[in-house]
Structure formats: structure tokens, C-alpha cells
């Protein structure tokens, strides 16, 4: 069985050796996991993967010294290997809840603990979070393209079994109505769903009669269950839909059937074919028969089908979700922001890679708008315990300024807002204290959070930007470190 805690890069451990030998192993470090830019011109992403991160952290240290000798050989590593074998994570971890909506540069996960313990979590944590957040964010986009149910059907296209199982979980959190993956359904208690393959139809003989026999047999062997006939194996309109109607009627499947029944289209002009199938089904009194559509769908194709008035009741989406096809690599990073109480940052040659230093906390501010109801108005990331953080915690009036335009600001008066802390402690002194949520609860939480943003902020194309700021104290700390660094660099470069 793989121990995912050691799905890591070797340099995490060679750096750890330096920390260990130089007496730095117990320095208190704070790392932030965050992303800089949302994919596909989104303003935000959907959090998924936190539960697997916690599980991974709990498995740290469950390996014999012989395991470490395989990649850290030699007598000079012997003492360090013994340390690693016994090393468990003893610090604290704060994380956003799965299903939360997160914006660029906000800490999704904050790791606070001894330096080596915190450092070696980087690679496996990013592996988990980048995969699941890519899938969840894409699934949210696909689901927002329609008000009709979207099922996740992408396991066969996923990048391995692990990706299929946890990708399906992420897709459901972000809005998918169901998944075809039975392992995800079994582990989560959420259940799974499915239809039939073309091979099922052709196994009864490559003929029109064989197609009817396939449908008839399936109905007879699955009475009381969902009955979805795949009707495009040979010809959708000239035999497929007609055989499905005949099989339904001959087996007494009509609008009184409680198990749910329908047909699936997997090729061709889905808008035209769905309209024709709807007409034929209705003519035969099967008005409750659902029409499912698959065939390399994504949010853009679904949006276009909806625009054309396609008679589709449910969509099945595979690789577009399972691989986050248009943006398969999510951009979470894991950066040191504080060491032994001293804030640090990475300045970099690229402005986008400049990070926020210090031990942080993010608040989401909600107001009751007379015309829109309860809506989120601004997110602000503060240094823990700074002036703005204290005001928000006390419910006092406060003002937030735009980080890049200090003339843009907004004041919230006492009593007119509610504040929600986005990062909650999930591991305390190495002990898992995270609350347990079902997959259905995570999905409901994500939907509820999304509905508190305005429609313009949720749209797929050119969404309106939601206000995301940092506190004055955090801004000033960042600027002071940068100013000091620039002076040091200038002095160093001119006096070398």
C-alpha cells in the first residue's frame, strides 16, 4: 500500500538534512498553500482535497529507517534516517473547508510547526490539492453552464485510479449530481450511477433486432432501477429511439414508473436529435422519459446546446471534468511566510510571484442587501491579531483599501456585517480535530457559498471581479520587507 506522505521530491529531504545538521529542525515555521491565478479566466477556485491532506499528514513517520536508506544512503545520513523514521507531524494546520470558494493569494492551508516537519509536507500536499482543485473548479464551471443535472463520467479518462476516485469526489463537491465511479460512491456513501455501453448493445448481435433485444433484456433484468437506453449504436432516429420506445411499452414502462427511465445520445447533432427524440417520446405518451446527452461535452458546448433549446434533461461529462481538460495543471504553491516569528517572503523577478508574508487569517464579509439578500461583499486577509483583525473579531467599524489603488476603499459600520473566518484549525499539536462532513454536506456547502456571490461574479465569461484585499498591517509589513531587501541588494550589487 502506498504511503502518500512520501510521494515527495528528494530535495525536501536533502534540505531537511541541512536543517537537521545545522540545528534548525525545531525552528517554528509557517507555510501557506495558495494559488496566484485562477484557471480559464475564473476569478476563484473551489477547495477540495483537505480531507486527503489530513490523512496524508497522519501517515507521516510510519516508515522504517530502511525505507529512507533507499534514497538517503550512506553513513552520514544514518542519524537523520532514524530521526525521519520516528518523525510525526506535531504542529498545527489551518485549512479552508472543502467546497469553499477561494480567491488568489488567500491561504487555503496554513501549516505551522517544526521546520522539517512542515517542509516535507510540501510535495504530497500540492499533489493532492492541485489535482482535486483543478477538477473541482472545472466541474463548477461545467455545472454553472446549465440548470440541469450534470453527471461525472470521466474515470476512464482520468490520470490513474487514484485520480479517478478523488476527481469524482471533487466533481460532486463542486456541483455534479452524480458519478459513475463505484469506488467513490462506495467510500463516500454518496452512491454511483450509470447507463450502458455500445458493447452491451452489440453483444446481442449487430442488427436492429439485436438492439431491441438488448433494451428488452436490460429492462427485464433491472426492474425498479433507473433504465437508460443508449440509442445511437446504429441509427438514433430510424431504429434506436423506436426500439427504446417499443421496449419501454412492451415492458409496461410508462409515466407511472418510479425508477426513472430515459434514453442517452452519445453522438451526432445533439440539439436536433434531442428535439426529434422528445417529439417521438411525447407522441407515444412517454412524456416523463428523460433524455441524457454525452459526447465530449464541456461548459461551452453545454451553453451552446442550452442556447439552441436542446431537449436535454441531463448531461454526462467525462474528460473535460476528470482531467480538467482545458487547464489540467492547477497552480497551488507552498511558501514559507514566517520562521521563528519573523516574517519572510519571496520577492522574485516576476511580480505575480511576490507573496504575502507572516502568519495570516482571512475573513469573508457578508452584508444584508435590501434587494439581493445576504451577499458576500469583500474578503480581507490580515496578519493574525493585527489591528484590522481585532476590529473584525470585535464587530467594530473598519475600512479596507485596495492593495494596488489606495484611493479605492470601502467602510463597513459596526452591526452592518457578518464576518466568517475561512481558515479553521484541523490539526492541533499533531492531532486531527477536523469536523467530519459527508460528501452531500460538502456539496451543499459549496452551492450555498456560491449563491452568496452575485450572478455577475459567477458567470463563465468575463466575470465581475469580487473585492479581495489585505489589511494595512499586512501591506505595510510586505512593503517594509521589500524596501529593506531592495536596499540590501542595491548595496550588495554596488559594493561587490
Q: What residues fall within each predicted segment?
A:
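Gly/Ser/Thr/Ala-enriched C-terminal appendages of enzymes
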Residues: 1-27, 40-42, 284, 297-496
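Buried, small/hydrophobic-residue-enriched core segments of structured protein domains
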Residues: 1-28, 37-39, 75, 81-284, ...
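N-terminal, Lys/Arg-enriched amphipathic/low-complexity engagement segments
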Residues: 22, 28-85
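A residue-level signal for beta-strand positions that form part of recognition/binding surfaces
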Residues: 30-32, 90, 150, 333, ...
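Short amphipathic alpha-helical segments
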Residues: 49-52, 76, 134, 438-442
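Short coil/turn segments at secondary-structure boundaries
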Residues: 68-69, 137-141, 154, 458-465
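Hydrophobic residues within beta-strands of alpha/beta enzymes
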Residues: 193, 263, 291, 313-315
Amino acid at each position: 500500500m502506498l504511503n502518500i506522505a512520501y510521494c515527495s521530491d528528494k530535495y525536501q529531504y536533502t534540505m531537511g538534512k541541512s536543517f537537521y545538521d545545522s540545528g534548525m529542525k525545531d525552528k517554528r515555521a509557517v507555510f501557506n498553500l495558495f494559488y496566484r491565478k485562477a484557471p480559464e479566466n475564473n476569478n476563484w477556485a473551489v477547495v477540495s482535497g483537505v480531507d486527503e491532506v489530513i490523512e496524508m499528514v497522519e501517515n507521516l513517520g510510519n516508515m522504517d529507517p530502511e525505507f529512507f536508506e533507499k534514497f538517503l544512503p550512506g553513513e552520514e545520513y544514518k542519524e537523520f534516517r532514524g530521526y525521519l523514521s520516528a518523525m510525526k507531524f506535531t504542529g498545527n494546520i489551518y485549512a479552508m473547508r472543502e467546497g469553499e470558494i477561494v480567491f488568489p493569494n488567500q491561504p487555503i492551508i496554513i501549516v505551522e510547526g517544526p521546520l522539517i516537519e512542515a517542509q516535507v509536507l510540501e510535495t504530497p500536499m500540492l499533489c493532492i490539492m492541485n489535482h482535486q482543485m483543478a477538477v473541482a473548479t472545472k466541474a463548477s464551471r461545467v455545472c454553472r453552464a446549465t440548470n440541469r443535472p450534470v453527471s461525472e463520467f470521466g474515470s476512464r479518462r482520468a490520470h490513474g485510479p487514484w485520480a479517478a476516485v478523488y476527481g469524482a469526489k471533487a466533481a460532486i463537491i463542486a456541483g455534479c449530481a452524480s458519478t459513475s465511479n463505484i469506488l467513490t460512491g462506495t467510500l463516500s456513501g454518496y452512491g454511483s450511477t450509470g447507463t450502458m455501453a455500445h458493447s452491451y448493445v452489440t453483444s446481442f448481435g449487430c442488427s436492429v433486432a439485436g438492439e431491441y433485444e438488448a433494451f428488452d433484456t436490460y429492462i427485464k433484468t433491472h426492474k425498479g432501477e433507473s433504465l437508460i437506453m443508449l440509442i445511437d449504436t446504429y441509427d438514433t432516429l430510424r431504429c434506436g429511439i423506436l426500439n427504446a420506445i417499443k421496449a419501454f411499452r412492451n415492458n409496461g414502462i410508462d409515466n407511472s414508473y418510479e425508477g426513472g427511465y430515459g434514453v442517452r445520445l452519445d453522438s451526432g447533432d445533439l440539439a436536433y436529435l434531442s428535439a426529434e427524440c422528445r417529439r417521438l417520446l411525447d407522441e407515444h405518451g412517454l412524456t416523463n422519459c428523460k433524455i441524457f446527452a454525452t459526447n465530449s461535452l464541456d461548459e461551452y458546448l453545454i451553453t451552446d446546446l442550452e442556447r439552441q433549446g436542446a431537449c436535454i434533461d441531463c448531461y454526462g461529462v467525462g474528460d473535460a471534468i476528470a482531467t480538467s481538460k482545458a487547464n489540467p495543471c492547477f497552480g497551488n504553491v507552498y511558501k514559507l511566510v514566517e520562521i521563528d516569528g519573523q516574517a519572510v517572503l519571496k520577492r522574485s523577478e516576476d511580480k505575480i510571484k511576490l507573496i504575502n508574508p507572516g502568519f495570516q487569517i482571512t475573513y469573508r464579509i457578508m452584508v444584508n442587501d435590501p434587494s439581493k439578500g445576504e451577499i458576500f461583499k469583500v474578503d480581507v486577509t490580515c496578519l493574525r491579531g493585527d489591528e484590522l483583525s481585532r476590529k473584525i473579531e470585535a464587530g467594530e467599524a473598519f475600512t479596507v483599501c485596495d492593495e494596488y489603488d489606495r484611493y479605492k476603499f470601502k467602510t463597513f459600520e459596526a452591526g452592518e456585517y457578518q464576518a466568517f473566518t475561512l481558515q479553521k484549525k484541523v490539526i492541533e499539536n499533531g492531532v486531527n480535530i477536523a469536523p467530519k462532513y459527508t460528501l452531500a454536506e460538502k456539496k451543499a456547502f459549496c452551492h450555498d457559498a456560491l449563491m452568496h456571490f452575485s450572478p455577475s461574479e459567477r458567470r463563465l465569461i468575463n466575470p465581475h471581479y469580487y473585492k479581495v484585499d489585505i489589511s494595512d498591517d499586512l501591506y505595510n509589513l510586505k512593503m517594509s520587507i521589500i524596501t529593506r531587501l531592495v536596499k540590501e541588494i542595491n548595496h550588495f550589487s554596488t559594493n561587490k
